[in-house]
Amino acid sequence: MVLLGRSAAELKAWVEAQGQPGYRGQQLHQWLYRKGARSLQEITVFPKQWRAALADVEIGRSEIRYRHDAQDGTVKLLLALADGETIETVGIPSSDRLTVCVSSQVGCPMACDFCATGKGGYRRNLACHEILDQVLTIQSEMGRRVSHVVFMGMGEPLLNLPAVLQAITCLNRDIGIGQRHITISTVGIPQQIQRLAQHQLQTTLAVSLHAPNQALREQLIPSAKHYPLSQLIADCRAYVQQTGRRITFEYTVLAGVNDRPQHAEELAQLLRGFQSHVNLIPYNPIAEAAYQRPTDQHLRQFLSQLQALGVTASIRRSRGLDRQAACGQLRQAQLIA
């Protein structure tokens, strides 16, 4: 049994099964989620003899393999999991919030052509406790409370929906992060957007679009061959109608590839009458791809074209770029010496 991810009631039942009074469950809950205990030996309110007897009980915490601090304050961690697999997670601070970009899988099966994670292949899904651990570890390393969580790290969250939903429940119930402060990002998986809508969450759905037509999207996102853009947009419209929540569309801008005037016109036509917002993300370079990052001037020009066509859009500035901690740059292994 892994303790991280258990509710206060479940922890109470567990300590009572160990022959301890029920209030120890609330103490355990506080030490796991508020104080970030990495082992039961740290929980000094427990009797020493009982702590010794629990030496083999797994809390579910990872080991930090390295930490890199970017010039803008962003922190990237490589975490080693219990089975030796590794993932990266990123803490993004600002004056009034701390956002954690969490991974949902070890690697990613989507193999997007401009993303470092997909270049390394896919290993497995993360368990709920491995997602929660990323939040608690960033919180401890950065010395402040996490306020926002975005499922935009390694992996495709909708291919690991049960663990992601369980993690969202725990983030809200046990760590105190409101659902409206949680974002789930997806490239689009058939039937999964509909399944997510059925849960009626107050989270934000971010759809990685990256192209305004089917042919170009298939070049950039191989899985798009199995999920026509027309169906994806139809599912997104149904999601908005069912949940009342606005969708964010992520659009990585690749110089000379998807940023021409005709692309702006196609995107405006695609999203006409849609309750949505488009985030333009300038491409963050990786060694395995030959794409180019657009100039700031060209990016602003593309934004202006979209806005003139009636698209609600903005430019999302990348954080942690100098430490390969930006969108599309996360990996399973350390590249920076």
Swiss-Prot record:
Pfam families: Radical_SAM (PF04055), RlmN_N (PF21016). Disulfide bonds join C101-C327. Its EC number is 2.1.1.192. GO terms for biological process: rRNA base methylation; tRNA methylation. Its cofactor is [4Fe-4S] cluster. It is found in: Cytoplasm. Keywords: 4Fe-4S, Cytoplasm, Disulfide bond, Iron, Iron-sulfur, Metal-binding, Methyltransferase, rRNA processing, S-adenosyl-L-methionine, Transferase, tRNA processing. It catalyses: adenosine(2503) in 23S rRNA + 2 reduced [2Fe-2S]-[ferredoxin] + 2 S-adenosyl-L-methionine = 2-methyladenosine(2503) in 23S rRNA + 5'-deoxyadenosine + L-methionine + 2 oxidized [2Fe-2S]-[ferredoxin] + S-adenosyl-L-homocysteine; adenosine(37) in tRNA + 2 reduced [2Fe-2S]-[ferredoxin] + 2 S-adenosyl-L-methionine = 2-methyladenosine(37) in tRNA + 5'-deoxyadenosine + L-methionine + 2 oxidized [2Fe-2S]-[ferredoxin] + S-adenosyl-L-homocysteine. The active site is at E88 (proton acceptor), C327 (s-methylcysteine intermediate). Residues 94-322 form the Radical SAM core domain. One of its GO terms (molecular function) is rRNA (adenine(2503)-C2-)-methyltransferase activity. Its main location: cytoplasm. S-adenosyl-L-methionine binds at G155, E156, S185, S208, L209, H210, N284. Binds 1 [4Fe-4S] cluster. The cluster is coordinated with 3 cysteines and an exchangeable S-adenosyl-L-methionine. GO terms for cellular component: cytoplasm. PANTHER family: 23S RRNA METHYLTRANSFERASE (PTHR30544), RADICAL SAM CORE DOMAIN-CONTAINING PROTEIN (PTHR30544:SF5). Specifically methylates position 2 of adenine 2503 in 23S rRNA and position 2 of adenine 37 in tRNAs. Belongs to the radical SAM superfamily. RlmN family. Reaction proceeds by a ping-pong mechanism involving intermediate methylation of a conserved cysteine residue. NCBIfam families: rRNA_mod_RlmN. This is Probable dual-specificity RNA methyltransferase RlmN. The lineage of its organism: Bacteria, Bacillati, Cyanobacteriota, Cyanophyceae, Acaryochloridales.
